[in-house]
Amino acid sequence: MPKPYSVKLQYLVPKIALTALAGKLAHLRAGWLTTTVIRWFAKHYRVNMLEAVNPDITSYASFNDFFTRALKPGARPLADAAQLCPVDGAISQFGRIDKDQIFQAKGHHYSTTALLAGNAQMAREYENGYFATIYLSPRDYHRIHMPCDGKLLSMTYVPGDLFSVNPLTAEHVPGLFARNERVVCEFANSEGKFALVLVGATIVGSMATVWHGIVNPPRRGEIQTWHYHDQDIRLKQGEEMGRFLLGSTVVVLYPETAQLRFQPGWHPLRAVSLGEAMAQ
């Protein structure tokens, strides 16, 4: 299938430089100009500011402050389910992992080993397991929360490209989520291990976690791993674990032993909300 022009263009533009510039601009505190940009963005993308702890657009000093805004308590009630949806967004794909192959879009798969930065040992944990890929659009709430209780085991920063991660790009860029910059966070609980993979994209200025702070920038040229086995970092189901600046994607991985049953109403492109039931 021929690639659309908008996808072809992504191969040509300097995505990393463009993203670095966007990140700097998003940190600017430019008074009325910042407010004007935020007001346009909120209107253009129909952002529901009534859900925010601070609904006053004029009070945000920078675009990043606005974009990582907190929600009011109770804005996303937690369902009674084993696994909760970790973000607001839209379902890209979900289901079983076929040995080590994760379904991206029609005609495209990628391996768990590639997604996990070549860590074959970690990838074996998820052979024939389960995955869910959720796309966050610019209008969505951009903090990521825990789908279940978990003790942090490790975090790995993986350098990569910065293609857009919207559905159109996912259909036309092979191995998209395994080639973009990403942060792999692995956890464990009484049921076994699971992983949350935060995938970067064009204009996504940075990714951060609650235990580390901003992971990128700086954008390192090599894989870097932090181990937390000797630290008792535990997060409860529904608790914040990280955040994006601008839209991106989260991939959740579970082992075969999880024996998950995804919600009957789940299907690709369906809008989902943080805290709703994802699987039993």
Swiss-Prot record:
Its main location: membrane. Its EC number is 4.1.1.65. InterPro entries: PS_Dcarbxylase, PSD-B, PSD_type1_pro. Is synthesized initially as an inactive proenzyme. Formation of the active enzyme involves a self-maturation process in which the active site pyruvoyl group is generated from an internal serine residue via an autocatalytic post-translational modification. Two non-identical subunits are generated from the proenzyme in this reaction, and the pyruvate is formed at the N-terminus of the alpha chain, which is derived from the carboxyl end of the proenzyme. The modification Pyruvic acid (Ser) is found at residue 248. Its cofactor is pyruvate. The record marks 247-248 as: Cleavage (non-hydrolytic). The keyword Cell membrane applies. Pfam families: PS_Dcarbxylase. GO terms for molecular function: phosphatidylserine decarboxylase activity. GO terms for biological process: phosphatidylethanolamine biosynthetic process. It is found in: Cell membrane. HAMAP family: PS_decarb_PSD_B_type1. Belongs to the phosphatidylserine decarboxylase family. PSD-B subfamily. Prokaryotic type I sub-subfamily. This is Phosphatidylserine decarboxylase proenzyme. It comes from Methylobacillus flagellatus (strain ATCC 51484 / DSM 6875 / VKM B-1610 / KT).
